[in-house]
């Protein structure tokens, strides 16, 4: 994800944007990385002093810093109209949070991008946050269910805008703009291939590794 972010910022070096990360440690690491590559960047998280948070926020609002790297502590009450992109380098815990944070891009009505970089370890981080919270078990279960929906969003082939609208109980046509709508890859039914793999594993009594299974399926004569 670091490589993607660096390449993206190089292509959009004159644009203002927000990069969200799930932990203070990750915010500070990303900020150091971007400064090392000479990007105009500020950071925001709850561990900074009130004065430092205010300064960094103002630097971003008045375009003295083009990019803000932040936890979800940043954004409430912020109305910066010319944000051209919002990148989530870590998956949020709920689709509501993602929708709210991604919606900080393009408030001036001009074309903008919302990008989610999905990594399994970030889902595990969200699991940790839920477990460490002082919520009761019923509330924790609801949070796990919301995280599951967020994971479904990250993996769906449906129009992303439709997915969000459906989640909030609304209907709408495909947007024609999201990465799924613009994906030109051809869908392929792999049911038969999957059945062959599972059958081979079963016939080999589930005792051999994936390399030998692959050799058998490809007709290799290796003994």
Could you tell me what each predicted segment is?
Residues 1-137, 142-145, 170-173:
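Helicase motor core with emphasis on the C-terminal RecA-like subdomain
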Residues 35, 42, 65, 108-223:
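Non-catalytic terminal extensions of ATP-dependent helicases
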């Amino acid at each position: 994800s670091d490589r993607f972010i660096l390449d993206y910022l190089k292509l959009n070096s004159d644009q203002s944007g927000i990069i969200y990360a799930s932990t203070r440690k990750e915010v500070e690491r990303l900020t150091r990385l971007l400064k090392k590559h000479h990007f105009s960047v500020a950071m925001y998280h709850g561990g900074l002093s009130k004065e430092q948070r205010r300064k960094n926020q103002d630097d971003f609002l008045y375009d003295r810093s083009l990019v803000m790297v932040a936890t979800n502590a940043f954004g409430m009450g912020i109305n910066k109209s010319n944000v051209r992109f919002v990148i989530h380098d870590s998956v949020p815990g709920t689709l509501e949070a993602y929708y709210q944070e991604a919606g900080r891009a393009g408030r001036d009505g001009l074309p903008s991008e919302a990008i989610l970089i999905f990594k399994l370890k970030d889902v595990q981080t969200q699991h940790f946050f839920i477990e460490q919270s002082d919520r009761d078990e019923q509330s924790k279960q609801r949070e796990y269910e919301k995280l599951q929906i967020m994971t479904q969003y990250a993996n769906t082939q449906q129009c992303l805008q439709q997915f969000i609208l459906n989640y909030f109980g609304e209907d709408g046509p495909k947007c024609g703009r999201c990465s799924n709508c613009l994906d030109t890859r051809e869908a392929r039914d792999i049911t038969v291939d999957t059945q062959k793999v599972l059958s081979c594993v079963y016939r080999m009594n589930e005792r051999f590794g994936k390399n030998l299974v692959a050799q058998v399926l490809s007709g290799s004569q290796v003994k």
